[in-house]
A protein has these predicted regions:
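Inter-blade linker and blade-boundary elements of WD-repeat/beta-propeller domains
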Residues: 458-473, 511-516
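Long amphipathic alpha-helical scaffold regions
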Residues: 378, 470-475, 518-521
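Extended C-terminal subregions enriched in glycine
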Residues: 517-518, 529-531
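Detector for outer-membrane/organellar transmembrane beta-barrel domains
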Residues: 494, 499, 507-523
Length: 605
């Protein structure tokens, strides 16, 4: 089989064939995986006639080449082997098609051959241009290479705005390839509901997702909010042809939902999705032919609950709905259901098994648990969630909630301000392969979660969690981390950019390095560029009261700042900043959303 670096292969099916009446169980292990390639699962037990699948993933650090992967089956004294010829291929062209580069949300662009620690400095690197647009760019821009537009091949930068517009630019020339409005006839963008979180208008807030294989030319998917002439609000899922910007068949799809529940704001035994009460802030997740959406409120304006929805990529029809707080009663402070999903604009994370991971915000959590350790009423406010998509149906599969979650919710110190990042497979001190995720919110702690056993809820301790780093982020996280060379990088509110190395599947309990500068509210979501494991650069945007600063650091020593956009004379590299901006790197350039453009940084001519 073949794998592309940064990609996931088709499942490999293993079957134990019974001979001479054999009916035992065969324990299968595998060996020979090349560096940077992981398998899930790595061990399994086969019964005759009951096949199981193994999925291979080539991470960003994988190298192109071939390998022989050996499956060894043992049952009693019997041993049998089978060999899989595995080819790891280099990525064909440059594509950044989803938030933070991939569904693990690690923010690692590993194919950068132009930008290096040697040439990123204010003498040779800076702002090349700004691509003007008609509103704020809160979503991360996306990038595709060799896109056919009007019979010509272009690299393309996909940009969406809070004015409800979507653009394609040629990032090399700065020319506009197409522009479309997602607003319906006689509609405007939504007002900001008197809330300063997304202001002064709400159009397209979420980072879209691109599927280059969909339809004749590929497609870009996003959610847009609007308001009609009768002051009714609309949320719609759009699918645009990547080459033309035209709406594809079935697009747009009006978003509506109900879910059984009797909590605050319910009607006749159901929670009903009110499009005016919500914003699609998180980045969209495309996984196994389904597009997943998560919803947040406007400044905690009740009533609202936590909604997760799935839509068919092919039809844009809704396939599944999960409400995270359907039965939350009306209570003081942060009760009333609530439990929204916003994560500072980070994308919902997804693993190779089809599970979704995210953190939800303050809201009702039922501390009365059923026999499986789940909230008896199905209310999961202020939790680190794992949601199964088996059969394209959303269902809570596991979770972690802190022992003091109620007091944290009451004090607005919940987990929901930060995003979840999935780590590559790691081996602990006992040789056990661990599948981990990392997340942090407002409470200043970093949580390292075992995705196979997240820890659930204990009212007196967090000991069931894989690892907790209390107070590691002095001001909390309104952002998410990035990952490079076995190190997690965080930039919390009012804190420095910090490097936490990983050894034996555990984070260092204190940072190995940190930046000299700190990041004011809301902190920063860093990204990383590298050529494989070499020439790494950590990129982060600082908000200085509306004036943005792009920083570049040496990942091996964050105290060594390579560049910042205030260094050049006469404001050459200045730009205005939005609150939750994630830098995107592709093909020798860095892209940063501003209040009315995308700032493009690269090597100066």
């Amino acid at each position: 089989m073949s794998l592309t670096i940064g990609g996931v292969g088709e499942p490999v099916q293993l079957t134990a064939s019974a001979l001479n009446g054999f009916s035992g169980t065969t324990n299968v292990s595998l060996s020979g995986l090349p560096a940077g390639v992981t398998a899930s699962p790595t061990t399994l037990s086969l019964s005759p006639g009951a096949p199981q699948n193994v999925t291979f993933t080539a991470g960003n650090s994988a190298q192109a080449g071939t390998a022989s992967v050996v499956f060894t089956g043992i049952s009693g004294s019997l041993t049998h082997t089978a060999t899989l010829a595995l080819t790891v291929a280099a990525s064909s062209g440059v594509n950044v098609t989803t938030y933070h580069n991939d569904n693990s949300r690690d923010g690692w662009y590993s194919s950068e051959t132009t930008l290096t620690p040697q040439n990123v400095n204010s003498n040779g690197f800076g702002k090349l241009r700004e691509l003007a647009v008609d509103g704020k760019v809160d979503a991360q821009p996306l990038y595709v290479s060799s896109l056919s537009v009007g019979g010509q091949s272009h690299n393309a930068l996909i940009v969406v705005t809070e004015h409800g517009s979507a653009y394609a630019f040629d990032p090399d020339s700065g020319g506009q390839l197409w522009k479309v409005s997602a607003l319906g006839a006689n509609e405007t963008t939504s007002d900001d509901h008197g809330c300063s979180q997304i202001t002064p208008e709400i159009g397209i807030t979420d980072t879209p997702v691109i599927d280059r294989t969909f339809g004749p030319n590929g497609a870009v998917f996003f959610v847009a909010m609007s308001k009609d002439a009768s002051s009714n609000y609309h949320q719609r899922l759009h699918a645009l042809d990547l080459s033309t910007g035209a709406e594809l068949p079935g697009s747009p799809s009006e978003i509506q939902a109900t879910f059984p529940g009797n909590g605050y704001g319910s009607s006749n035994g159901n929670q009903v999705f009110d499009p005016g009460q919500y914003a699609e802030r998180v980045g969209l997740l495309l996984m196994n032919g389904q597009i997943y959406l998560g919803w947040t409120s406007h400044c905690d304006e009740d009533p609202y609950t936590g909604w997760l929805m799935g839509y068919s990529e092919n039809t844009l029809k809704q396939t599944s709905v999960l409400n995270l707080t359907p039965n939350g009663p009306s209570t003081p402070h942060y009760g009333n259901g609530e439990g929204s999903i916003w994560m500072a604009g980070a994308g919902l994370a997804g693993d190779s098994q089809g599970n979704i991971f995210f953190l939800d915000a303050n809201g009702t959590f039922d501390q009365t648990l059923n026999s499986s350790g789940f909230p008896a009423q199905g209310d999961f406010g202020n939790a680190f969630m794992k949601v199964s998509t088996t059969g394209n149906q959303l269902a809570a599969a596991d979770y972690f909630a802190a022992y003091d979650l109620q007091s944290e919710s009451d004090a607005d110190q919940d987990l929901g301000s930060g995003g979840a990042m999935l780590l590559p497979d790691l081996t602990d001190a006992n040789g056990v392969t661990r599948h981990l995720a990392v997340g942090a919110g407002k409470d200043t702690n970093i949580y390292l979660i075992d995705r196979d056993n997240m820890g659930k809820f204990n009212p007196s301790t967090n000991n069931a969690v894989h690892q907790e780093l209390p107070g590691a982020l002095s001001g909390g996280a309104w952002s998410m981390p990035t990952f490079f060379n076995d190190t997690v990088y965080y930039a919390g509110q009012g804190d420095h950019l910090k490097a936490f190395p990983i050894a034996n599947a555990l984070l260092a309990t204190s940072p190995a390095a940190e930046s000299a500068n700190s990041f004011a509210y809301p902190g920063s979501t860093p990204s990383v560029s590298s050529n494989g494991s070499q020439n790494g650069i950590i990129w982060a945007v600082e908000n200085q009261s509306g004036a943005g600063v792009l920083h570049a650091y040496n990942p091996a020593n964050l105290g060594t700042e390579l560049y910042d956009s205030n260094q050049a004379a006469d404001g050459r590299d200045h730009f205005t900043d939005n609150k939750f901006v994630t830098p995107m790197i592709a093909n020798g350039k860095v892209y940063v959303g501003t209040t009315n453009s995308v700032a493009v940084f690269g090597l100066l001519p």
